[in-house]
Amino acid sequence: IDMMIDDDTSIYANFLYNKYDDEELRNKEEFGSLRTGNVYAGSSEINRIRRDAEVRKRIETREIKTVILGGETLINGWFTEVQFSHSYAEENDTDNVDVTFRSDRIDTDDCGGPCGSFFYQDPQKVGLSLTSYAQGVLYADLNVDAWEEDWSLIKDTETAFSIDMTKDGFTFMDVPTTVKYGFKYRSREKKGDSNAIEVDDDDVQALLQSEFGPYIRSWPFAGQQYGPHADENLLYARKGQYTGGPDYDNFEEDFTTNEDITALYLMGTMEFDKALVIAGIRVEDTDFDTLGYNDGDVNDVLTASKSYTFVSPSLNVKYFLDDQTIIRGAIWRALSRPGFGKANLIADITERDDGNYRGEMGNPDLDPYEATNFDLSIEYYGDGSFASFGYFKKDIENAIYPLAVANTTVNGLFFDELLTFVNTDDSDVDGFELNIFQELNMLPEPFDGLFVSMNFTITDGTSSLDVDNGTVTFPFRKLSEDVSNISIGYDKNKFDVRLSYVSRSPYLDYLADDDSETIQEDLDNNNIRYTDDHTQIDFNLKYKINDNLSVKFDINNITDEPEFYYWGTPNRLSQYDEYGTTYSIGIRYNL
């Protein structure tokens, strides 16, 4: 809603409401208690094995409400913008049920030799071959191992207020200058109330898989039988029968986190004959506090707080070489605060006899990610064409990684070993980017609407972490060295069509395998997880019916490319995912 009060003043109100259900069905096959025998080039013998078959059904309701009120006016020649906003988001995850069935453990004595073999000639699609005896035991009518039900509710509330004032007509260094300054305050609270109960008593463990309508799911990978698994609808039908219903509360994953941010800024825009210079400074003050419970014990409350101030100067220069060529340069400081999920005091820690601690916990002592950034580029604007080439560099402090650490202090407690999030030491990222766009308007109609677009980025990034025996250096997290995007499209009249080829090289996903209890002293390439290179083809179509109404149709990952994760080298599988091709259609109407 927009309203003009007079020639100088207007007000507006924006409202957003969004609600949707996210339903997930998870079937999991897990082979544990493993012991291998002889190991060959593409396989290894199985001398001991056990099978778990787990089914989880989850229905989560997400709801978002946002109100934004604001206005613009002139006050003594200053163009003034005022805005107030309030938002509320809720994740209601109160429909969660999980059952795990477990086989007996068998070994070479039971099987009369090896119980089978794993084969991994194709490292992306490993397989399993079992003897007939092993199949009869592992895929028999299994007993329930555990029944679990979850109820959780996460509430996220944010209130913000800002005021910005702008005025031109100033002179600095004999150059026309526009001055802008402002203030912003943001207060956010996030609360989590998560409850879970697991039942593994004799009555539950006497239940058989055959009582849950087991079925074998179709599965595309050779050497893998997927199931039998319980019918998820029968799980929901039995909710509350074994747990006694939702009349309980625990605090294991409960938390309350608050973050208040106050910011002031001042900037000036100077208009030279052939250049535009924008210089400014921003000061942000952050107050953070969080509360949680150790291992769900309401009498063992953990609290933490942190306050810090960040000063961010910036300088941006745009220089016009001629009517078609621009050189841009910028240097600035930037801040990224730790996410609540990394800093929350959700903890499962124990005190040892020597007074030290061990366990898993968020890290409220995390410092914010800080970066000094430099960009330099040249741009060319032709008739129906565009090209740019640029260099960028980032000097980063306090990059955040998940990691198991040893002999460290977090929130005033000394840990022999802790799975948490840590700040690394210095990180560096630099690279080059090339963009090219060309309309093919020299072609005859109707082909003059065709265009070609290309983007190529080459990046090098590293992080370092001090350990007792020196410094470990590794690639910057989630950063591919090579990324490219090539598109051919058609944009004319009512049609906007694009076919894109997107490619990226491997990148570091995270440090160390949680299950291997690798601490920072043991880091090497063999226990660092990487995401393999990926290429996909996407198609996008937009059609404008009239000035108000348009439709769109998208196809993503047309060739059904998988995602592959590995430890150190591509022949050591961590995870292999097939997502398929995604189709979407939408309608947009502008009032």
What function would you assign to each model-found segment?
Residues 1-35, 52, 60-70, 76, ...:
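Transmembrane beta-barrel wall of Gram-negative outer-membrane proteins
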Residues 7-8, 72, 76-81, 115, ...:
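Short loop/turn motifs that connect adjacent beta-strands in outer-membrane beta-barrel proteins
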Residues 17-21, 75, 86-92, 153, ...:
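Transmembrane beta-strands of outer-membrane beta-barrel pores
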Residues 44-48, 109-146, 193-254, 406-420, ...:
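Flexible glycine-rich, low-complexity coil/linker segments exposed to the extracellular/periplasmic environment
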Residues 49-66, 249-261, 306, 335-396, ...:
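Outer-membrane beta-barrel signature, preferentially recognizing the C-terminal barrel domain
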Residues 393-396, 405-407, 411-513:
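Gram-negative outer-membrane beta-barrel transporters
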Residues 450, 503-518, 542-591:
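C-terminal beta-signal and adjacent terminal beta-strands/loops
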